[in-house]
Amino acid sequence: MPKKILIDFEKIKDPYSGLGQFCSHLKFYFDQSQLNLNYWIPGKWQKLAKKCHHFLPKSAVFHAVHQDSPYLPNFKKTKYILTIHDLNALYEQTQFGSGDYYKKKLQHKIDHASVITFISEFTKEEVRRHFKVDLLKTKVIYNGISLGEHSTPPPKIPTKPFLFSVGTILPKKNFHVLIDFLKQIPDYQLIVAGTTFHSYAAEMQKRIEEEGLTDRFFLVGTIDEPQKLWYYQNASAFIFPSLLEGFGLPVAEAMSLGLPLFLSDKTSLPEIGGPDAYYFKNFEPDYMRDVFLTGMQDFSIEKKNRLKERSKMFDWKQAASRYLELYENI
């Protein structure tokens, strides 16, 4: 009988989150595999016992698809694969004095993993910097892109050439720097899409109103995939000033449409954006304006084509194939 492989797909319950998308796309290709794959999507009663490996079904291999998964197998009987997306939780918890506890928990997982996968070289190096890791058991497997083919006009249609950005509206995304930047480029509007539950979004909206930019800077909230595709297809450029990314999926998405990319030079973004993106080394409004205007003048059909070709590195079918190979050979 083929070995049983158990995969923690609990996050698939939240399909609009980054981890939910990660699980959904892998599952689509996993469902076509001949391996003995089993998906762990626990119900409410099972969550009460989530710290106890005895409540996990027995398996030869267990894959925790993100670093904060609370589920652990019996390490003596089960091969453990751990995927690490980023260390954002470590940085955030360190600010509140609980970083040491978080490090201890994650180090325990790293120590017991047979294989550790990372979604970028940057994340791999960050983990090496903070934790003891056996490099012989590490692999980098990039995430993929899945934008669909059909777009739908969103409720908010810009009336001028516009820049687009997308992501949960949180301080680490650094979207507030775009307010003063937009004042420097009066010929453009700006659309920022993403969940607005955090107080940071309300603070941004207040500043947008105070600066008289309500007719040019739009926080449009959550949008669906066809609406997001419409914005990508019709934007003049994509802008992403984020300070903390383990990968940067919106960058890869915009790249697949050949959009000019204007990105923070922080964390994983230069790795994903590559040499044909334009980077902000700081966020002074005048400097950002100069980088943007110079980049728009410099951008060419050759750059557009190179970006589209580069985006083929980020493919869910290829990612799924590499995970399946791990399961088979571990």
Model-derived features with residue positions:
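Carbohydrate transferase catalytic cores enriched for Leloir-type hexosyltransferases
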Residues: M1-I330
